[in-house]
Regions:
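A residue-level marker of the well-folded mature domains of exported/periplasmic proteins
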Residues: 1-261
Length: 261
């Protein structure tokens, strides 16, 4: 399913390296939202395949080869770590830099620095408000959200409560998908209610709330055992959310990463 998502943008992104020229030994930096997951692994592999084809097209070998690296935060959605990675990559003066911004406004200082040093920036997966971006490669996220809403409506006979799980509350892709889902339901499905919206970058806070609820249950059952947030699993968080919404007929997740949580 992840490859299908990548294929959707292939005509606008990478289908051929014909006509592309880069100096020998050029370095390209790719920065995603996470270091290791199925989706981001596919992004990294796609970049490597493109550079391999480019080196073959230009006849570059050995030290002359164009190089590409993929980096992302060890914890998905970590804005500070992504900015630190961006700082480190700009210090290497890449020939070009592609980034999937976690926060639409957090990278402006770094983007200014890249512009001053003639480093072109391409955004993919999600975008920012920065005016100097050379190109953007992404899904129509609002339309994707509307499609998700339509699909859920068909599954629950256009009535009932649903829960919405969003990958974060900072990126344009997440905001547009959430907007598309909520707007479509409000406009076309008056008997559907979104009874809860949960953001995965608030997961630590959700674990704290779950720990408090589990501790209360222990006390009600005569146990003094206190549950700590560190011991709470993502499965327990989900179970607690579903317990709070017993009438929920479905859940909408805005990304593949959310469904893996």
């Amino acid at each position: 399913k992840y490859q299908t998502r990548l294929n959707m943008v292939q005509p606008q992104a990478y289908s051929s390296v014909e006509g592309i020229k880069l100096e020998k030994g050029s370095y390209i930096s790719i920065i995603g939202k996470a270091e290791d997951s199925t989706y981001w692994d596919e992004i990294a592999k796609g970049a490597e395949d493109a550079v391999k084809a480019l080196n073959e097209q230009l006849g570059y070998e050995g030290k002359d080869k164009i190089k590409v690296t993929y980096n992302g935060p060890s914890h998905e959605g970590d804005v500070d770590e992504q900015i630190n990675i961006l700082d480190e990559e700009l210090d290497r003066y890449p020939a070009a830099l592609a980034i999937a911004p976690i926060d639409r406004t957090a990278c402006e200082v770094q983007f200014d620095l890249a512009t001053e040093n003639d480093i072109p920036i391409v955004e993919f997966d999600s975008g920012s408000d920065y005016q100097g971006i050379m190109a953007k490669v992404m899904t129509n996220n609002k339309e994707a959200g509307m499609t998700a809403a339509d699909k859920m409506a068909s599954l629950i006979d256009e009535q009932g409560e649903v829960l919405l799980f969003v990958q974060d509350n900072k990126s344009t892709s997440a905001q547009d998908r959430e907007s598309g889902i909520k707007g479509q339901i409000q406009a076309h499905y008056p008997q559907i209610q979104i009874s809860g919206t949960y953001y995965m970058d608030d997961l630590e806070e959700l674990k704290k709330m779950t720990a408090e609820k589990l501790t209360e249950k222990n006390k009600a059952n005569g146990s003094e055992e206190e549950v700590t947030a560190d011991s709470v699993t993502e499965e327990q968080v989900m179970a607690q959310i579903l317990e709070q919404h017993p009438n929920a007929k479905g859940c909408i997740a805005t990304s593949g990463e959310v469904t893996e949580k």
